[in-house]
Swiss-Prot record:
Membrane topology: Peripheral membrane protein
Class in the EC hierarchy, top level: translocase
Organism: Mycolicibacterium paratuberculosis (strain ATCC BAA-968 / K-10)
One GO-annotated biological process of the protein: protein import
Enzyme Commission numbers on file: 7.4.2.8
Catalytic function, reaction form: ATP + H2O + cellular proteinSide 1 = ADP + phosphate + cellular proteinSide 2
Name used for this protein in its record: Protein translocase subunit SecA 2
Family of the protein in this entry: Belongs to the SecA family.
Gene: secA2
Phylogenetic classification of the source organism: Bacteria, Bacillati, Actinomycetota, Actinomycetes, Mycobacteriales
CDD domains: DEXDc_SecA, SF2_C_secA
Binding site for ATP: Q94, G112, E113, G114, K115, T116, D501
Length: 777
């Protein structure tokens, strides 16, 4: 069999690779050479039976991936296995992508270039090197789809593969985690980690020790979702915000009673508004010690819900429930909610019964979850724009992978208008003009409200457009699959993470040539996002695999990204008087949009960094708790410590009951009070954070104060938990007919559930780090 003739990976300068934080020149050159060398083994691999192919994979020496001489053989075996198992023969660029992930990089591969296949090959490579791999996806659908799609390839190399979704039982989860490669959403992996913190027997553990995380849509998971806390809650009774305050805030007037900043990220009472609220609540002083951490906090939360959070932008209401919208993905954020007070305030604002939230038993951010893994790598279509965050927060490099075929998509410069109204009119006319030719059009909008308004306008003009947003995301795969069909107009919210490719001519590509002759898929953006990555994700839907395509973005000086980041008085306002359409003719317009977007990205990076420093303290404290809990769960430490703390009681029980049962009792008691203390600590931290910004009134740095209070409280948590365990041990009713505390009183919550918190991203406070003292022996 002759060498496979594939397009050679493109060339990038060594300096450029170093700037990306990727591999050294030596390793980069080695990757390119290894891909080329692998073709020499294609004939040999093709001549093997399926069984021989599996055995050959198992005989590879990949223990040292950086130095192994068997990499070319591995790539040849993987290429042959992929073609047999999936019908897809990997291109050289896909093998290059797999190698860069095996080197620990995040790769950037354009939409339609085959990231899923490259990821499966990389996962197999890690396993053959003796590692265990979690392929982390952004939702359950992709986890199951990719596991079933790529499973035959992984199994063809003699390895096992499993997948996990929200419906998976504990037994199914253990079985899936026991496989060599496990596909699961970041949510489910996190929830399993949290649920394991409630078990009192090692046999009940589900989640294994983290080893390799190979992350699909890496920028979405590692950047956009990084600070989202995953939460484990248990049944309890908690007070909801007072309805009188929520109703009162709803009657306040903008500009008189409250003000917002330029980009509507913050809202605050004016002096007039504060006096109005104080009078309505019986003449209280909102800023007195009695009310500053309670009533004022309730008012601020209600004000946030009423003013800043908009229906069909930040959330939708469906089936008498508030559903949050994930802005970076354009779909409902399943199992996600705001912090309790804010969630209740929004529900009250919409006239919906407040949902039960319970008591937070444990929490972990996505960033802290991923940082548990010894090795992290990933793939996405837009890694370069997230390179700074990936380096700063994960120490990850980025490797751009050139396309298999040259990208011939034509990207037109932004069309910029003075007003949003003029822009929207121009968008409708442009879509109609293109639609009349039969060329398929994909329109990317920034939120649900905008998508529905544009959809209605198109329908009124006789354009049979299809809309896809958070309200009908169950139809996602079908709608996206047909978006490249002749004459189809699709209006969609954010395209990130929509795993279905758009093929010219429809899912069956029946009209591929006809659509290609018209110019392929035409993408229209209704405005710049706050980050270039999201714009590029939309553009990247056109021009797949060397197909023709085009894109154009429409913007206005009234768009959010401009209004918040540029001085309107310095913007060019010249338009063409002959057209009268309000379009800016200045050549500086596109450059100003780029500048506004860079400013927005810089602000978001600052917010991420500051919020990370806040969350880092909690992550450090949680790590100490987890370490202590594992020690109690897996060793005889609980029995030994209680024997030392209460020797008389211990000897009394040791004479009456078997040592194994006594050890179980000691472990149960110690774990209960440790978990109880941690839950109380989390509640305390939540209460502090609700009002910590008010410390600025006393000229204190709010988050420095948060750190001080959190560290002080954590130091006492250990002593309090041990003391409580000692008291329980000495008074518990262990022996038959013995008076004292019934151990059944230490029961765990009768029910638990998990959810994600869309934490308040509007704070941009700064904080400094404080060291954590050793709190457990």
């Amino acid at each position: 069999m002759p060498k496979t003739n594939r397009a050679q990976p493109g060339r990038l300068s060594s300096r450029f690779w170093r700037l990306l934080g990727a591999s050294t020149e030596k390793n980069r050159s080695r990757s390119l050479t290894l891909v080329t060398d692998s073709s020499e083994y294609d004939d040999e691999a093709a001549g093997l039976t399926d069984e021989q192919l599996r055995k050959a994979a198992g005989l590879l020496n990949l223990e040292d991936l950086a130095e192994s001489e068997d990499i070319p053989q591995f790539l040849a075996i993987a290429r042959e296995a992929a073609e047999r198992a999936t019908g897809l023969r990997p291109f050289d660029v896909q093998l290059l992508g797999a190698l860069r992930m095996l080197a620990g990089d995040v790769i950037e591969m354009a939409t339609g270039e085959g990231k899923t296949l490259a990821g499966a090959i990389a996962a197999a490579g890690y396993v053959l090197a003796g590692r265990h791999v979690h392929v982390v996806t952004i939702n359950d659908y992709l986890a199951r789809r990719d596991a079933e799609w790529m499973g035959p390839l992984i199994e063809a190399m003699g390895l096992t593969v499993g997948w996990i979704t929200a419906e998976s039982s504990s037994e199914e989860r253990r079985a899936a985690y026991g496989c060599d490669v496990t596909y699961a959403s970041v949510n489910e992996i996190g929830f399993d980690v949290l649920r394991d913190q409630l078990v009192t027997d090692v046999a009940d553990l589900v989640s294994p020790n983290p080893d390799v995380a190979l992350i699909d849509e890496a920028d979405s998971v590692l950047v956009d979702e990084a600070l989202v806390p995953l939460v484990l809650a248990g049944t309890t009774h908690r007070e909801t915000p007072r309805l009188e305050i929520i109703k009162l805030v709803g009657e306040l007037e903008a500009g008189t009673d409250y003000d917002t900043d330029a980009d509507s990220r913050n809202v605050h009472l004016t002096d007039v508004g504060a006096r109005k609220v104080e009078k309505a609540l019986g003449g209280i002083d909102l800023y007195s010690e009695e009310h500053v951490g309670t009533t004022l906090t309730e008012v601020n939360v209600a004000l946030h819900a009423h003013v800043l959070l908009q229906r069909d932008v930040h959330y939708i209401v469906r089936d008498d429930a508030v559903h949050l919208i994930n802005a970076s993905r354009g779909r409902i954020a399943q199992l996600q909610r705001w912090p309790d007070g804010l969630q209740a305030a929004v529900e009250a604002k919409e006239g919906i019964e407040t949902t039960e939230t319970g008591e937070v038993l444990d929490t972990i951010t996505v960033q802290a979850l991923i940082n548990r893994y010894a090795t992290v790598c990933g793939m996405t279509g837009t890694a370069l724009a997230a390179g700074e965050q990936l380096r700063q927060f994960y120490k990850l490099g980025v490797s751009p992978i050139p396309p298999n075929k040259p990208n011939i998509r034509e990207d037109e410069a932004d069309r910029v208008y003075i007003t949003a109204a003029a822009k929207n009119d121009a968008i409708v006319e442009h879509i109609i003009e293109v639609h009349e030719t039969g060329q398929p059009v994909l329109v990317g909008t920034r939120d649900v409200a905008e998508s529905e308004e544009l959809h209605e306008r198109l329908l009124r003009r006789g354009v049979p457009a299809v809309v896809l947003n958070a309200k009908n995301d169950a139809e996602e795969a079908q709608v996206i699959a047909e978006a490249g069909k002749f004459g189809v107009v699709t209006v969609s919210t954010q395209m990130a993470g929509r795993g279905t490719d758009i093929r010219l001519g429809g899912s069956d590509e029946a009209d591929h040539d006809r659509v290609a002759e018209l110019g392929g898929l035409h993408v229209v953006g209704t405005g710049r996002h706050h980050t270039e990555r999201l714009d590029n994700q939309l553009r990247g839907r056109a021009g797949r695999q060397g197909d023709p395509g085009s894109s154009v973005f429409f913007s206005s000086w009234e768009d959010d990204v401009v209004a918040a980041n540029l001085d309107r008085n310095k913007l060019p306002m010249e338009t063409d008087p002959e057209t009268g359409d309000g379009r800016i003719v200045s050549p500086k317009a596109a450059g100003l949009l780029d500048h506004a977007q860079r400013v927005a990205e810089g602000r978001m990076l600052d917010v991420h960094a500051n919020t990370w420093r806040y969350n880092q303290l909690i992550a450090q404290q949680r790590a100490i708790i987890v370490d202590r809990r594992n020690t109690l769960l897996r060793t005889a430490t609980a029995r030994e410590e209680l024997a030392e703390l209460a020797p008389k009681r211990y000897r009394e029980l040791a004479d009456e009951i078997p040592e194994e049962r006594l050890e179980t009792i000691c472990r149960h008691i110690m774990l209960y009070h440790l978990d109880r203390g941690w839950a109380d600590h989390l509640a305390y931290l939540a209460d502090i954070r609700e009002s910590i910004h008010l410390r600025a009134l006393g000229r204190q740095n709010p988050l420095d104060e948060f750190h001080r209070l959190a560290v002080d409280a954590f130091a006492s948590l250990a002593a309090d938990a041990i003391e409580a365990a000692q008291q329980t041990f000495e008074t518990a009713n262990v022996l038959e007919d013995e008076p004292g505390l019934d151990l059944s009183k230490l029961a765990r919550p009768t029910s638990t559930w998990t959810y994600m918190v869309n934490d308040n991203p509007l704070s941009d406070d700064t904080l400094s780090t404080l060291s954590l003292p050793g709190v457990f022996r």
